[in-house]
Amino acid sequence: MQKIRKGDKVVVLTGKDKGRTGEVIQVMPKEDRAVVRGVNVVKRHQRQTQNQEAGIITKEAPIHLSNIAIADPKDGKPTRVGFKIDGDKKVRVAKRSGDVIDG
């Protein structure tokens, strides 16, 4: 079970976007990276194709999982993630507040 999943609210811990929050769009477990909406935005030069014009486009680049942390559901501050067995399901728990991250 992954600690960070698609749709999670995360906080950037280091780098040029330190302190910013965003939603995880995509997780790449093999590369240990994630794409976060509005974070680590880069400009790329796009060649013209049949269905797209040429020009400079902005998009989110992947960020390493060690540089992001899940936002605590209670106060929005970064927290580590633990696991707990709730009935017959394994759920993620915020270490900071003890709240269940996913139902």
Swiss-Prot record:
GO terms for cellular component: ribonucleoprotein complex; ribosome. Signal peptide: none annotated. GO terms for biological process: translation. InterPro entries: KOW, Rib_uL2_dom2, Ribosomal_uL24, Ribosomal_uL24_CS, Ribosomal_uL24_KOW, Translation_prot_SH3-like_sf. Pfam families: KOW, ribosomal_L24. GO terms for molecular function: rRNA binding; structural constituent of ribosome. Keywords: Ribonucleoprotein, Ribosomal protein, RNA-binding, rRNA-binding. CDD domains: KOW_RPL26. Belongs to the universal ribosomal protein uL24 family. PANTHER family: MITOCHONDRIAL RIBOSOMAL PROTEIN L24. Part of the 50S ribosomal subunit. One of two assembly initiator proteins, it binds directly to the 5'-end of the 23S rRNA, where it nucleates assembly of the 50S subunit. This is Large ribosomal subunit protein uL24.
